[in-house]
Amino acid sequence: MTVDVLIRAVNNPTSAQDLVKNVAQLAATKDEQAIPTLVEVLKFNNPGAAVAAVNGLINIGEAVVPYLLENVDGYNYGARAWMLRIFAGIGDPRALDLLIEAANKDFAFSVRRSAAKGLGNIQWHKVPDSEREVQQQKVCDCLFLALEDGEWVVRYGAIAGLEGLSQAIPEARKIVIKNKLTEFLTTEPEAAIRARIQKAILSLP
């Protein structure tokens, strides 16, 4: 089926299950023409279809980012939460400020976790040299704050984010992250988090 036919199928499903199937088929095309329709699906009350749309949009990649930034829905929280997951999955630096705010301030812990983890996935080579150090410091500060989150899954995401960030920063900054994680290891009550910290520390020099 052509992309046009698949788009019409998404817009005219016969059931909730049919919608999920149609979205998955459209997402599998990885066609930029599908972006507006897949983004619209995020506003539907159908988590299965939304997950398929999110995965499809992440697979399309950076071409999705400008459209998403123009269409972030501040009034539809569910759609906004899905969009943040897409930004986190793509790692485009144009969404940095949104991810930083979400990691520390979003009321849903699942969104905070996704944003924190996604901050370790930023494509730093796309950030101008003159801005990179400042932006990386902002991300580092954000993730250090996320380590204090009351929800353990957010702390877990922050550790993954710091581990990812450490692969893109100067050695001196890696030492700062390693020292912070070593300190955090002594106060973290959750065994799963402590194990994740130890894994992250081992990946650092």
Curated annotation (Swiss-Prot):
Gene Ontology CC entries for this record: phycobilisome
Positions the record marks as coiled coil are: none
Q: Does the keyword Lyase apply?
A: yes
Which InterPro entries does the record match to this protein? ARM-like (IPR011989), ARM-type_fold (IPR016024)
Q: List GO molecular-function terms, semicolon-separated.
A: lyase activity
- Record's keyword annotation contains Oxidoreductase: no
Give the E.C. number(s): 4.-.-.-
Which UniProt keywords are present, listed alphabetically?
A: Antenna complex, Lyase, Phycobilisome
Q: Which domain of life is it from?
A: Bacteria
Q: What class of enzyme is it?
A: lyase
Q: What does this protein do?
A: Required for the chromophorylation of the cpcA gene product.
This protein's assembly is summarised as: CpcE and CpcF associate to form a lyase.
| Membership in a protein family | Belongs to the CpcE/RpcE/PecE family.
**What name goes with this protein?**
Phycocyanobilin lyase subunit beta
Q: What is the lineage of its organism?
A: Bacteria, Bacillati, Cyanobacteriota, Cyanophyceae, Oscillatoriophycideae
